[in-house]
Amino acid sequence: MMESLTVNENTINEFEIKNDIIIEQQQIQSKTSIPLLNIKDGNTTTTNTINEINNNNNNIETSTMSRKSLMTPSATYESLIRQQKTKDCNLTVKVFEARNLIEARLRKREMVKNGKSFKRAQNLLTEISSPNLMTFSDTTDPYCTVQLEKQKQRTRTIPKKLNPFWCEEFQLEISDPASAKLVLSVMDEKKYSNDEHIGKLVIPINTLKDQKERELWFPLTQPQSSKKVPQIQILFNFKPISLTDPSQPGHIQWKVLFGRNLSHSLATPLPSMSAASMGGSTSTENISNVYTNTTPFINWSVRSKKGDIVIDEEGIAWQDALTNGITRELKDSIECITFTLWRYEPKTFSDDGDISGLKSPRGTNSSASGSGFIPSTPPPSSHQKSNDTTATTTPSSTPSTPISPSSQSNNIKTPDSKTRSSSNASTNTPQTTPKSTGTSGGPAPPETINLSSSINSTSSLISNGSINVIDSSNNLHHHHNNGTNIMNPLKDGYEQYFIGQGIVLASHIDIEKPNDQWLCLYPKQTLDNKFGDIRLKLKYSEEVVLPLQSYQPLLELLQQENLYTITLLGKVTKHRESVSNNLIRVFEKTGKCLYLLKSLTDHEIDSTNNPDIIFRGNSLATKSVDLFMKLIGIPYLSQTIGPLIKKIYSSKKSCEIDPTKLEKGEDIKKNCKNLLSWVKKMTTAILSSVNNCPGPLREVFKSIQDKVVQRYPKDEITRYTAVSGFIFLRFFCPAILAPKLFDLMPDHPGIKTTRSLILIAKTLQNLANQVEFGEYKEDFMKDMNRFVIDNMENMKSFINTLSTVPADCPPGALQSPIILEKELACLYRHLIKQRQDMAEEMESTESEPKTQQEKDSFGKLIKILNSLDEDVQLASN
């Protein structure tokens, strides 16, 4: 279905825009409109009319701002914006690694213990007769699945590892952020049986809606655990200490707004409210004035950037946190805040009347609900002095439903009821992670923030409702909560039940303005109930997508002949790949992508004095050409090397020629023949595919080669390597190394296949670079030098042919449709984020002096961004 860049007559009539506005818009369009825009939808092209910005400043300003000046006051324009706007919600998930996964033998023992194994008697006999004997199925080959709504992705399998490192990234679309949940499952791949579940993690998307990047360790729960993750909504007001004057303290203020999934079977619903602002009036309709045994309590602690626990408070009643909130002074820069929720539950009595077990609430499984008990005797906090004492408060209220003999009789443990046992193991909660550094064996595990002191102190048995606060000098202060009475569990027959624990990073809290956050409460992991941890990087993005006509001035400015705005953005942005992706899709949709790529590559060639390093960096030009090849060249790639990749996957022949990696019994000469055979087939397939290469790609390569010959007329190698650096180093070779990422195969290759693909790609890369293998680096590859030398001329001939554009070239095809307004919304967001950096670049004296045209173009950009800001605010309200 064809798209239109302007509001048609039916749309105008539908929203009843005033006649004078229509007339003025038509007058403006008649002055500056020319047939310009080719909008592509698959292989179909239609020509539309779009306003072209004139060189006359008055006409440009009128064309850019007429929509705002004439239509903003109109209610019809507001309704048009609000009704036609959409939201583009995406989630980027990077799965780094897992640690401390359960061995297969331990999982099998647990299945036997729970009676879930089909061969229970046989497994029991094996465990008794030879407990240390590991069978073939006892190895753990973990992989991770990522599921969101109907989308499901998976990582490659890492064989025989309990601490696998995947480092794979996935892009997921979200249709309903309010209810969507990200579900990650760590699986154990089995060759002769169904894959086994190791652990699971559920992350509600609403906890990521602040759109801030998170890199954390998350605890895995048992595979059968519920998807209903306990959550609390907290309103923060945060002022950090002054960096210039440390004597000026800051403050942290928080209040609970709402609780979700805190209990699965409560006789009385949890009190909840929705406060408009910190310290404002609150409604008491949903607030219970009587405490019950199901009402949760909150422990919280604050960790400084020095690693000290500067605040540690326990036993704050839910209603106090809900109505009054907590305010504390800060004398240190803080790193994170930990919240722990728990509640009282009746103890379970054995048949003889003694307390002998702990009963799950109303038959629910504690692990399934993400809960467990707080250990009653934790180790002392390392930040508290040995002579620290705890002040006590006088009780002022009692529980609403004390235990009666009848209720005790109802809670007597039966053989069918599940029991819980407390543990002194430290709670494992999400922890922050600095950037990891690569080593020869992969990136080293990150140094996580150790919250053991905070966790131990908040997990301790709370007596008489005392609250401990530790200042920066580690002196213990006592604060009393006079409005709350916390009952004595030993006296009243109650004990503490752990609901969950979560962490808020100080960097995720807005400074000096109220902001609310949803916090997931993750389960306690004990020695008997530990499934491992997984490290993730999460980034949720939500873009308000306005109607296409709202972005028309921005599109016109981006497509100006001089490309000043794009050049300026490319200099300052750190997200070149994302910017390049949006630019390529916008210009491809409007039929001007080749002009964009030629301008960017010409500029980079002109600014590079050394031909040996041309296109070696990740600039806006290289990223744009790279993404353009993937945008329209995937069918060509699949047709050229796809069948060979499938044969290599199914082949059991080894190509390993590195003596240090040979398996026992392998013949290096035989492996070398296998490798040479695959390399010859792959090279032949690529060199003979030149006529199948899409015409737009060949036009880009022709432009690059012509410019290189003009810039370096005496260089005989760069004219070939400049092109092969794209078609081989950024297209064919990466696809050979990772076929799944290029949709060539549904799964990642195995270990032996991966090694074969690596050696094939190495040989092709040297052939494309016109370089032989050396004696000092990877000297085991020297046997491939004869093949490289023999095919250098064939490679040159292929590059020369590829850089010509005959009339019968195939056009290329898009794998997915391009939605122009969505791509422009992303570009608008990039420009907003880089607005200040772009202004500083314009004023910088270190760079080349800016021309008047560049200054005028930047001024127009600021006006357009301000106009779009108003539209986005209007659409969001």
From Swiss-Prot:
It comes from the Eukaryota. InterPro entries: C2_dom (IPR000008), C2_domain_sf (IPR035892), Ras_GTPase (IPR039360), RasGAP_CS (IPR023152), RasGAP_dom (IPR001936), Rho_GTPase_activation_prot (IPR008936). Residues 591-802 form the Ras-GAP domain. GO terms for cellular component: centrosome; cytosol; leading edge membrane. Residues 389-409, 426-438, 447-456 have a biased composition (Low complexity). Residues 72-218 form the C2 domain. The record marks R616 as: Arginine finger. Residues 350-456 are annotated as: Disordered. May function as a Ras GTPase-activating protein. This is Probable Ras GTPase-activating-like protein ngap. The lineage of its organism: Eukaryota, Amoebozoa, Evosea, Eumycetozoa, Dictyostelia. The gene is ngap.
